[in-house]
Structure formats: structure tokens, C-alpha cells
Amino acid sequence: MKAIIPVAGHGTRLEPHTLTLQKCLFPVAGKPVLEHVLDRITEAGVRDITLIIGHLGHQVKDFCLTYENANFTFVEQTERLGLGHAVYQGLDHSDEPVLIVLGDAILELDYNNLIKSQYSTIGVAPVP
């Protein structure tokens, strides 16, 4: 199984902070949000990860060079046409199952059970 993680957005609601730091790299509990996401999915056995980058994408690449538990592929979304477009750009159109995870959201999901499901599954968590 591979994962697609879209992290191309500008994070306009977090400006001016996102003018200099990609929002998936904002620190939460001592490490970037993206690191929390990567830790959760690699613990579930996902190692092949495609990141859809755009705004400040070089920062995401630099961070991933320091992360040792995964194999990364980067796809640049040059035209911002929404989340669906970003995910579509990351698909390789193989029959391999794909886990799509947002790179700027820390969710308490059981990724092991989600991955083991024989059905297409949507993981949804309430936002307080």
C-alpha cells in the first residue's frame, strides 16, 4: 500500500505565518504536524509515500530528507485546482490500494484497521 499526502496549499487562514513556513511543518507537541502524520502511517506499515507539494514545497522536501522510515516521491501541483486534483496527480493508476491522508491534520484513527479493511473506507473524525 502507498499513501498520498497533499501538502500543496498556501494556508491562507494562517497567514502571515504561512508566508515563511509550510503549514504542515508547524510544530505541535514538539514536532511538525507532518511528522505526526508520517509516524502514524509508517507505524501501520505504509512506507511508499507520495507528497503533493506546491507552496514552499522545498521545505517539505528538506524535512522528508531527515525522515528515515519511508520512501518519498514528490509531485508538484503547479495549478491549484483543489484537493481532488491534488490526489489525482499522485495516483499512478495501478491496482495497488492507496491511503489518502491530509498532511496538516493530526487524527486519532486506527490506521492498521483502516488499511486491513477489504472495502473502500473513509476515515472521519469529529472536529470539536
Provide a role label for each language-model segment.
Residues 107-128:
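Conserved core of the sugar-phosphate nucleotidyltransferase
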Residues 19-24:
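Short alpha-helical oligomerization interface
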Residues 9, 104, 126:
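Active-site glycine-centered loops adjacent to acidic/histidine catalytic or metal-binding residues
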Residues 15-17:
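Glycine/threonine-rich flexible loop motifs
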Residues 2-5, 13, 27, 31-102, ...:
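Conserved N-terminal catalytic core of the sugar/cofactor nucleotidyltransferase
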